[in-house]
């Protein structure tokens, strides 16, 4: 039987789980969902497709229309990919502090890229995206930080995939918080199926907004903008673990060197948070699932892999 996708968007999802054998400690049962297997190499492919599907269904996005979005990078890449496949113009606004690889990939998909002052964080990018959209007839803002189509993608697909692939054997789920859509959607599915699943959110220690701290610069690209997004459901999270940028970098490097998994900085944060949880004696016989959001290839120019070119 032929298996041919109609467009690249049909390749999104059904990413694999792999056992983590070394970096989170010995004698623990940890598996990771590797989202780099999506066509644009990140978990953001999922909600980009979901947001565009919803905008098409509502009539807000017409053929030949324009999609505008503020992003730290991966959502911009994903929207640019799906937009290219469906014939939309795409304008991506991101802080200039994001990696050069992210910028280049957005442009490679034919999208327009607008860079904002890093001092303003993602909030400044959001304001600029709103200004651009207001001046372009037929433009919509994807609004990943407020759009219910974001967590809906993970309720419909990501969470169900994890449950199916583990045959319902999930005791703990650990994930970083960027928009919050991934952890909120996955947690909703897992909690509906088993209310005892323990949900752990990972945040940058330098910007501990989820535990009442103040926003501050940090180096974990993709985690925690300088505000708590509407798409994050705090009520479904049981615990928050804070991870230093340096620790996230260390775990991402170790994932490549010890597991053969070339992943990004936010994946390092997820693994570091998982290691904290997995070290607890009461979880020795429990299955812990984490999610690795993207590939390390778009961080080769950053501090994550500094010095490799020598």
Regions found by a protein language model. Give the residues of each.
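PLP-dependent amino-acid enzyme catalytic core
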Residues: 1-310
